[in-house]
A protein has these predicted regions:
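Short acidic-glycine-tyrosine-enriched beta hairpin
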Residues: 102, 116-165, 206-209
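A short glycine-rich, His/Asp/Glu-containing loop-to-beta-strand
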Residues: 58-87
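Glycine- and acidic-residue-biased ligand/ion/polar-headgroup-sensing regions
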Residues: 87, 98-120
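Conserved short histidine dyad/triad with adjacent acidic residue
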Residues: 81-96, 161-163
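A short hydrophobic beta-strand segment most commonly corresponding to one strand
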Residues: 102-104, 174-190
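C-terminal edge-of-domain segments
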Residues: 191-213
Length: 213
């Protein structure tokens, strides 16, 4: 994967968020959730404010073999979390349950690989209320749409309600850990995970690592 040109372009920040106490960050997210939530409103907020480093530390949890999801705030309309990425961490290919999402980098960098589902042998499972898909297909066809590099000060990565599918990687060759902030509306308690090699998909429940099981 040749990322030299992408990395060079991303070294010039397009925004510089102001570090604020986590309480102020939470108050801002809560206030936005009380009104009409739009992709642009949350984008603008995350491009303007970030959790200051001394407060960020309390939300960092590190495991050697996978990323961790650490809740900062949640209500019925929105959730915000800090995700910690050890070296070499890779998520499964997944959906976002038909919700809006935003990701901004605080430390390190990540690669986002975007995909489109072209077809499966359980298309009727997508025609349900309340979730994006029941999953359960045993034959899937996926198309790779390319990659995005996400860095501090670079464009936020966003997902929309039309079943954005991606996976996220912290490449071994970078030899550094990464920390990102994710906001979703509404909160996501489960998603569809795709096993391309096995040609199947299934639903996976999600949890916060900084809360008791």
């Amino acid at each position: 994967m040749d990322l030299h040109n992408t990395t060079a372009a991303a070294t010039h920040p397009i925004y510089s968020p102001t570090p604020v106490p986590v309480e102020q960050f939470i108050d801002g997210i809560r206030e936005l959730s009380a009104g009409l939530i739009t992709k642009q409103k949350i984008y603008d907020f995350l491009a303007t404010y970030e959790i200051r480093s001394e407060d960020l530390e309390r939300y960092k949890m590190w495991l050697p073999d996978r990323h961790t999801r650490n809740k900062v705030f949640r209500n019925d309309m929105i959730e915000a979390m800090v995700i910690c990425w050890p070296i070499g961490a890779i998520t499964p290919l997944h959906t976002h349950n038909g919700q809006l999402g935003w990701m901004t980098m605080l430390e390190g960098k990540l690669i986002v690989e975007n995909y489109k589902q072209l077809g499966c042998n359980r298309p009727e499972n997508q025609q349900v209320v309340g979730i994006d898909c029941l999953a359960g297909a045993t034959r899937i066809e996926m198309q790779n749409l390319g990659t995005e590099l996400v860095v501090p000060g670079g464009p936020l990565n966003t997902v929309d309600k039309t079943q954005t599918i991606h996976r996220i990687k912290n490449l071994e060759e970078w030899n550094e850990r990464a920390v990102s902030v994710h906001v979703y509306s509404k909160p996501i308690d489960s998603c569809v995970v795709f096993d391309i090699e096995g040609g199947r998909c299934f639903r996976r429940d999600l949890k916060y690592d900084n809360e008791p099981a």
